[in-house]
């Protein structure tokens, strides 16, 4: 019982999937009151013979990060102190570093990175293209109301293609010639009856989906030529592109849309639901009820889980594959105001980022619900959108008229190792 009070010892096995940091798989007797700090000291002493001392680790006990004393963690999990405990250790993900601040003339409500380019959308109705080194390339007028979402369709050495959506009820397709730095509107996509809040391009870049305040989900062609229109002329000559499909089911605004695969999408809404749509059936495949309006949602192709951002300051984790559709897998505490935006890493299975009205971005590990890995500070007003499409950069836009660019800590270390 002494260990339960943080006094006595606990038998543990230290395990890792990173073989170069492995220690002998034998029981170790450690004090029940240890935290991550003491475990790091203990583990680094064991690793001295491998020349790996000085490495910072995080520790997983029953699939959750240790964030306090070991005895408190075990008590919370109702784990017997008499049993040998497996503790998994992983090299700590390095802290992202602030790299740049991109100044705009109005709120930045949409950001999306692709390679060395950053696409931004603003409340002054303009789209902007920047390099990830902070050089402004182009300001693009066209919409007649604030931009709400942007996404890249394709990118090569000569051209970039992207889509933007706006409170003006339209989506617009664009083609940018990189060499001449000239942009052309390929099509104006009309069909929504209220502002278009969300957009996502399909994995094959042939279609894109939009979600609107009119509660409708619409699917559009992303091709330069849309044969259904009977012409391949540009919008200056041919006018409007119409949706390929309209799907109804939400009762309030669709705030998030993402392709899960070539025929499946997930949407999040202010109506407190996540819906998974089957485009082949042209209907809802799964519905997950939540207890709060959803401002954003992100699906991970690596772990097949969905994380949501809501008005109650929390993020929540769901599994659309389970029959228990209303059960939350985890709740993440740390923001102090509405959480407006969230996105999974597309290379790190357990990591995601969020941005909030509390002016902060946070980097999370989904196995650490009690605290984020890092706070990413810099914005002076509420954060409106965050993006981690480029694994090397976390990019966010806010009501302080700036885009903040953070370099991934892992990218920083890789650069140092190659010098």
Curated annotation (Swiss-Prot):
GO biological processes: maturation of 5.8S rRNA from tricistronic rRNA transcript (SSU-rRNA, 5.8S rRNA, LSU-rRNA); maturation of LSU-rRNA from tricistronic rRNA transcript (SSU-rRNA, 5.8S rRNA, LSU-rRNA)
Ubiquitin-like (UBL) domain: annotated span: 10-91
GO cellular component, one term: preribosome, large subunit precursor
Keyword field: Nucleus, Repeat, Ribosome biogenesis, rRNA processing, WD repeat
GO MF, one example: ribonucleoprotein complex binding
Gene3D superfamilies cross-referenced by the UniProt entry: YVTN repeat-like/Quinoprotein amine dehydrogenase
SMART domains: WD40
InterPro entries, A to Z: G-protein_beta_WD-40_rep, NLE, WD40/YVTN_repeat-like_dom_sf, WD40_repeat_CS, WD40_repeat_dom_sf, WD40_rpt, WDR12/Ytm1
Compartment list: Nucleus, Nucleolus; Nucleus, Nucleoplasm
The keyword rRNA processing belongs to this UniProt entry's keyword annotation: yes
Alphabetical list of Pfam families matching this protein: NLE, WD40
WD repeat start and end residues: 103-140, 142-184, 191-230, 249-287, 289-328, 334-374, 378-416
Free-text function comment from the UniProt entry: Required for maturation of ribosomal RNAs and formation of the large ribosomal subunit.
Family: Belongs to the WD repeat WDR12/YTM1 family.
Protein name: Ribosome biogenesis protein WDR12 homolog
Organism: Drosophila virilis
UniProt lineage: Eukaryota, Metazoa, Ecdysozoa, Arthropoda, Hexapoda
């Amino acid at each position: 019982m002494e260990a339960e009070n943080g006094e006595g010892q606990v038998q543990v096995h230290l395990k890792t999937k990173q073989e170069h940091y492995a220690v002998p798989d034998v029981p170790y007797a450690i004090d029940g009151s240890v935290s991550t700090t003491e475990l790091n000291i203990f583990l680094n002493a064991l690793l001295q013979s491998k020349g790996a001392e000085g490495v910072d680790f995080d520790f997983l006990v029953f699939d959750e990060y240790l964030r306090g004393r070991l005895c408190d963690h075990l008590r919370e999990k109702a784990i017997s102190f008499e049993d040998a405990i497996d503790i998994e250790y992983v090299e700590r993900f390095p802290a992202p570093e602030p790299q740049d601040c991109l100044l705009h003339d109005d709120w930045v409500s949409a950001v999306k990175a692709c390679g060395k380019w950053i696409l931004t959308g603003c409340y002054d109705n303009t789209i902007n293209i920047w390099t990830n080194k902070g050089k402004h390339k182009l300001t693009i007028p066209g919409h007649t109301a604030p931009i709400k979402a942007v996404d890249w369709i394709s990118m090569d050495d000569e051209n970039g293609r992207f889509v933007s959506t706006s409170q003006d009820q339209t989506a617009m397709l664009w083609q940018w010639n990189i060499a001449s730095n000239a942009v052309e509107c390929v099509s104006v996509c009309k069909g929504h009856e209220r502002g278009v809040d969300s957009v996502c391009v399909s994995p094959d870049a042939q279609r894109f989906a939009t979600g609107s305040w009119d509660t409708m989900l619409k699917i559009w062609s992303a091709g330069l030529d849309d044969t259904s229109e009977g012409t391949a002329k540009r919008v200056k000559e041919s006018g409007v592109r119409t949706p390929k499909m309209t799907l109804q089911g939400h009762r309030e605004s669709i705030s998030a849309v993402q392709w899960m695969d070539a025929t499946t999408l997930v949407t999040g809404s202010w109506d407190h639901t996540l819906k998974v749509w089957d485009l082949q059936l042209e209907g809802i495949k799964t519905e997950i009820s939540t207890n709060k309006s959803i401002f954003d949602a992100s699906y991970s192709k690596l772990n097949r889980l969905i994380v949501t951002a809501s008005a109650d300051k929390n993020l929540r984790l769901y599994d659309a594959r389970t029959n228990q559709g209303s059960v939350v897998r985890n709740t993440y505490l740390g923001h102090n105001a509405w959480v407006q935006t969230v996105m999974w890493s597309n290379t790190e299975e357990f990591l995601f980022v969020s941005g909030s009205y509390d002016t902060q971005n946070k980097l999370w590990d989904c196995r650490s619900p009690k605290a984020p890995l890092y706070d990413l500070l810099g914005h002076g007003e509420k954060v409106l959108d965050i993006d981690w499409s480029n694994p090397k950069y976390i990019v966010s836009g806010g009501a302080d008229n700036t885009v903040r660019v953070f370099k991934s800590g892992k990218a920083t270390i890789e650069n140092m190792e190659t010098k």
